[in-house]
């Protein structure tokens, strides 16, 4: 390697070229039983223990547990009617002898269609033997709404980095998952190929430099 630099990019899922990372969302899966959104592939593999290299930042220093991730995936709230029901006999609810009716409990959960973008970090380097500029992906992160800012019309959604997956450790999982090929639907890609071959459009928002990644 003659030279190299680490760069961070954001992949906007509203761009058509990036649709294979987003679709099919829930509701479209039956028409494409062999394909799932990238978000579902990642979250399912984490829950099943197939992906274990999951971190809280793109520097891959502090791991996130499944419990940490699940705390950001959903929230449970009680409706006003449910609170009134609880206030009628609050001691019984505190002791657990009574429970709020299920119809008055609201659960909000992050779904594949909530993913707004992906952030990726990779390493560009010049291979002097082959005389080529090459790219090696290091990590990927779904950007989703903070679940605690969802479901309230008066609140402005805030977006968070859900988790960072160390890409080299997830390649087996991504190689087994199919993505749509815009040019030839009869021949699907794998997510591993799509990401590693940079078949997406990204905008650089950070780069490695002497000032400390700005």
Language-model regions: role of each:
Residues 1-129, 169-214:
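A domain-level signal for the mature, folded cores of soluble proteins
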Residues 113-115, 135-137, 160-162:
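Extracytoplasmic
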Residues 118, 123, 138-141, 165:
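Generic beta-strand hydrophobic packing signal
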Residues 132, 137-157:
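Extended serine/threonine-enriched, polar tracts that run as long, contiguous segments within proteins
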Residues 158, 162-172:
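Short secondary-structure subsegments characteristic of cysteine-rich extracellular domains
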């Amino acid at each position: 390697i003659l030279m190299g630099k680490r760069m961070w990019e954001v992949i906007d899922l509203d761009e058509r070229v990036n649709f294979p990372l987003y679709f099919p969302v829930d509701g479209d899966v039956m028409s494409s039983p062999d394909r799932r959104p990238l978000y579902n592939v990642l979250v399912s593999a984490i829950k099943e223990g197939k992906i274990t290299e999951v971190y809280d930042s793109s520097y891959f220093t502090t791991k996130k547990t499944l419990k940490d991730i699940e705390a950001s995936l959903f929230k449970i709230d009680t409706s006003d009617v449910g609170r009134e029901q609880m206030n009628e006999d609050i001691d019984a609810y505190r002791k657990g002898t009574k429970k709020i009716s299920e119809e008055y409990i609201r659960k909000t959960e992050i779904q594949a269609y909530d993913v707004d973008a992906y952030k990726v970090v990779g390493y560009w380097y010049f291979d002097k033997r082959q005389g080529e500029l090459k790219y090696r992906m290091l990590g990927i992160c779904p950007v989703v709404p903070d679940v605690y800012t969802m479901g309230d019309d008066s609140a402005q959604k805030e977006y968070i980095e859900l988790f960072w997956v160390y890409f080299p450790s997830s390649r087996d999982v991504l190689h087994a998952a199919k993505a749509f090929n815009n040019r030839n639907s009869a021949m699907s890609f794998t997510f591993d190929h799509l990401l590693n071959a940079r078949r997406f459009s990204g905008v650089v928002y950070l780069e490695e430099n002497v000032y400390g990644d700005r």
